[in-house]
Amino acid sequence: MINKAILGGTFDPIHNAHINVAYEALERFNLEEVIFIPAGNPPHKIKLKKTPAHIRYEMVKLAIEKETRFSISDFEIKSKGLSYTYRTLKHFKEKEPETNWYFITGEDCLSYLEHWKYIDEIFNICNFVIFSREGFKEKEEIIKKKKSILLKYGKEILFMDASILDISSTKIRNRIKEGKEVSFYMPDKVYKFILQNNLYK
């Protein structure tokens, strides 16, 4: 069976940590492909100001262009309404029903995971992978959440210690506003694109 993963995010901007997570997942889960999906209108970020979708899409495209096992989808940014994870996963599962799908997201999602729309269906569609920037310690809250989800949905959440730098898109945007150097946080073409388009000033 073919294994593929979906890595969704606002990618505002995409940075080296996103890329490293994708590479880590390729090896860990024997993936044929990681599909980057720039978020359209995520329900938990409705009020947050975002860079236009076509610009975020272009930055992701530039960041991954040299890796044949990475691809990009405009499914969410072209879809109308709120960008629910369930709708995205359902789309790809219907497109490739024989594929074994993984969905990769950050540790911060754990706290409200059970409140996601159609979370029970999401668990039926894919393997849920949580990654941490700092590496997973057996924190009490994580152990409780793992047990809770296993009991409620009969599904095991997969955890991935991603060897990544302490980088966030928010940190990058703030550093640019402050006139600080950010080139080492992202692929060179993304950095040049940000400069050329005067983003995040």
Swiss-Prot record:
InterPro entries: Cyt_trans-like, NadD/NMNAT, Rossmann-like_a/b/a_fold. One of its GO terms (biological process) is NAD biosynthetic process. SUPFAM superfamilies: Nucleotidylyl transferase. Its EC number is 2.7.7.18. Keywords: ATP-binding, NAD, Nucleotide-binding, Nucleotidyltransferase, Pyridine nucleotide biosynthesis, Transferase. It catalyses: nicotinate beta-D-ribonucleotide + ATP + H(+) = deamido-NAD(+) + diphosphate. Pathway: Cofactor biosynthesis; NAD(+) biosynthesis; deamido-NAD(+) from nicotinate D-ribonucleotide: step 1/1. GO terms for molecular function: ATP binding; nicotinate-nucleotide adenylyltransferase activity. It comes from the Bacteria. Belongs to the NadD family. Catalyzes the reversible adenylation of nicotinate mononucleotide (NaMN) to nicotinic acid adenine dinucleotide (NaAD). This is Probable nicotinate-nucleotide adenylyltransferase. The lineage of its organism: Bacteria, Bacillati, Bacillota, Clostridia, Eubacteriales.
